[in-house]
A protein has these predicted regions:
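Short acidic-glycine-tyrosine-enriched beta hairpin
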Residues: 109-125
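Sec-dependent signal peptide recognition
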Residues: 2-10
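A short, N-terminal "cap"/entry segment at the start of jelly-roll beta-barrel domains
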Residues: 18-70, 85, 155-193
Length: 193
């Protein structure tokens, strides 16, 4: 058998072999397409002593849902009168996109009214609060430049369908610790090693 023929046989035989896998620089991230109601559906725990109903939200993009190392995205509906309490993120920047409804927003030391289609950019260390001032639900999309805050969201919620128990003030404080965020009415806790 000629050397060329031997080489051709060797190439054909090895064609079905899988080469050694090299790690992707993007880790376990994978492309995903999610429809409106797809994602990790969770129900927020109501806060003890605060008249706030449980609300549902969808974690859509993050380390556990898509393997993302650089983005976190969730969606939520806020009923008329519902609010996102005043808080800030220590290391992450955030974007809120108001898809439907009307919101009054406190951003840093300024106030704004934001209608459907409006967008709010929140740099790290900036206080943010939002209230639904309209007659319809606010549908919003929240995006962070890096994961982490989803652990606070998971801490303060349960998977949809599980029993929902109120969360204490200390519980809220502990949850905000998980997300490297600070709630105005709750003193921050030292980070655990």
């Amino acid at each position: 058998m000629s050397n060329v023929l031997k080489l051709l046989v060797l190439v054909l035989l090895s064609a079905g072999c899988t080469p050694a896998q090299t790690p992707s620089p993007h880790g376990d991230a994978k492309p995903v397409v999610l429809q409106k109601n797809e994602g990790e559906l969770r129900t927020r725990k109501p806060r003890e002593g605060v008249a706030s109903p449980s609300t549902d939200f969808l974690l859509k993009i993050g380390p556990k849902t898509s393997g993302s190392k650089h983005l976190l995205l969730f969606t939520e509906e806020l009923a008329p009168g519902a609010a996102i309490p005043k808080h800030k993120h220590h290391g992450e920047e955030e974007i809120l996109l108001i898809q439907t409804g009307n919101a009054h927003v406190w951003l840093g030391d300024k106030e704004f009214d934001v209608q459907a289609g409006g967008l709010i950019f929140i740099p790290a260390e900036t206080w943010i609060s939002l209230k639904n001032t309209g007659q319809e639900n606010i549908s919003l999309v929240a995006v962070w430049n890096e994961p982490g805050f989803e652990e606070m969201l998971r801490c303060g919620s349960v998977p949809k369908g599980q029993a929902v128990e109120p969360i204490s003030r200390d519980g809220v404080r502990e949850c905000y610790h998980h997300g490297d965020a600070e709630l105005e009415v709750v003193q921050p806790v030292d980070k655990k090693p």
